[in-house]
């Protein structure tokens, strides 16, 4: 399991004639109805991403994978003026890359290029978006690749565990749908479905553009003028339906596999709220405690994890994860660690040390233009792109008592999912957390010896 920190700096906003400017040079521009978030940097690599809001709210259950397939085909299947091979050859010559990704809340079409090749690369990017060939032969190739990838996901225990947990928590809502599709839905999609869907997808109300790199604003607007500015107004983006953890639940799925996989899911605050960044910070410290107690001291798992998942913007989650041959002891230790924090809180030292690590991570991960574009887009989809520049100030101001209060506020009911040997666990092994105001039992964490 991977942790990805998303960080954001305090912003002073002033109004300029074309849009709002942030202290760090990030600028919001409204150009003929299209929202543009432009961050000028000294980097010689430029990234442009067109975000489409809605995510899985845009598709039905039978259409799972349709948006991802449509965008991938548009960017890699050639255009009406340049076939796939010619398009790929030109991209290689320029050193330009194109890719499309889909998530539960939005999709993204991205181009990354060298500054010197900005104009030519933009022309290709805009041509692919506005005039894709949507060729049937290329469609079949991409669809088959996606079917193969979906089948591999089904056979991967970690991916299977996440799918089981998502179905259990979000079942029947938009967030239960798989953006990249499942084999049965992908195999039933036709080229006509793709053409019809793509023709109605893009519009200024639903889309926004993020550009990060060393290009002039005048060059950017000039390139947009005769391309994306021509997008139709379109329809308002749809808000996804979702569910929350409301009561203790345990789903045990029997599998004859060597290692047992466990995922606990809890409700978490939305990222753009006051509690969001604090809770993410707290979960990062919990991750460290899990690593020490579950891996270093007990060797119960190679990669235990605790993290704040923002993959579902309207209902983020806290995740408790472990793969282990001893699920009983692992479950006990996982909940003991949290109960210990709820009782005694985080220490001043670990909060101070984590601040340094967090901010170092921020500066290192934010060097790439593609990463910055992705995080600016995520923050905009979450409510406000300025959040991207607020994390430094918020983390610097974190006080241990506030962190403990935020952690206790959300560490309540756990939705457990288990994939492994059924005879290794019983329902009662899947513990729930003690209430925050309840006197907790003395932790036995220090007494348990390494196995």
Predicted features along the sequence, with ranges:
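N- or domain-start disorder-to-order transition segments that initiate the globular core
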Residues: 22-46
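Short, solvent-exposed loop/turn elements at domain surfaces
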Residues: 37-38, 45-48, 57-60, 273, ...
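M16/MPP (pitrilysin/insulinase) zinc-metallopeptidase core fold and M16-derived inactive scaffolds
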Residues: 49-112, 285-298
């Amino acid at each position: 399991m991977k942790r990805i920190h998303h960080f954001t700096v305090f912003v002073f906003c002033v109004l300029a004639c074309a849009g709002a400017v942030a202290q760090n040079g990030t600028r919001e521009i409204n150009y003929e109805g299209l929202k543009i978030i432009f961050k000028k940097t000294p980097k010689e690599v430029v990234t442009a991403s067109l975000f489409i809001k809605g995510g899985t709210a845009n598709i039905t259950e039978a259409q799972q994978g349709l948006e991802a397939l449509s965008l991938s085909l548009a960017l890699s299947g050639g255009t009406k003026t340049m076939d796939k091979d010619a398009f790929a050859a030109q991209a290689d010559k320029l050193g330009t890359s194109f890719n499309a990704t889909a998530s539960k809340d939005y999709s993204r079409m991205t181009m990354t290029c060298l500054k010197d090749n900005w104009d030519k690369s933009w022309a290709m990017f805009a041509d692919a978006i506005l005039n894709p060939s949507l060729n049937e032969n290329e469609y079949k190739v991409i669809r088959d690749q996606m079917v193969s990838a979906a089948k591999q996901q089904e056979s991967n225990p970690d991916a299977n565990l996440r799918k089981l947990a998502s179905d259990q928590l979000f079942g029947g809502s938009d967030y239960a749908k798989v953006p990249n599709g499942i084999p049965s839905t992908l195999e039933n999609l036709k080229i006509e479905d793709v053409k019809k869907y793509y023709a109605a997808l893009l519009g200024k109300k639903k889309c926004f553009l993020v550009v990060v790199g060393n290009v002039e604003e005048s060059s950017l607007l000039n390139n947009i003028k005769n391309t994306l500015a021509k997008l139709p107004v379109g329809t308002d983006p749809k808000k996804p339906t979702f569910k929350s953890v409301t009561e203790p639940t345990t789903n045990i799925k029997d599998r004859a596999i060597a290692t047992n996989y466990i995922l606990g899911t809890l409700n978490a605050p939305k990222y753009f709220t006051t509690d969001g960044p604090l809770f993410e910070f707290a979960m990062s410290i919990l991750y460290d405690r899990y690593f020490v107690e579950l891996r270093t001291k007990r060797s119960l798992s190679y990669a235990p994890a605790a993290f704040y998942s923002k993959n579902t913007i309207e209902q983020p989650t806290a995740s408790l994860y472990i793969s282990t041959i001893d699920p009983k002891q692992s479950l006990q230790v996982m909940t003991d660690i949290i109960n210990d924090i709820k009782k005694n809180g985080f220490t001043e030292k670990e909060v101070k040390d984590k601040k340094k690590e967090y901010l170092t991570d921020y500066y290192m991960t934010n060097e790439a233009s593609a990463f910055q574009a992705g995080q600016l887009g995520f923050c905009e989809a979450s409510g406000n792109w300025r959040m991207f520049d607020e994390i430094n100030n918020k983390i610097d101001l974190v006080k241990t008592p506030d962190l403990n209060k935020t952690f206790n506020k959300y560490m309540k009911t756990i939705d457990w999912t288990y994939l492994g040997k059924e005879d290794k666990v019983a329902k009662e092994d899947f513990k729930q957390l003690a209430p925050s105001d309840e006197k907790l039992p003395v932790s036995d964490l220090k007494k348990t010896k390494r196995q």
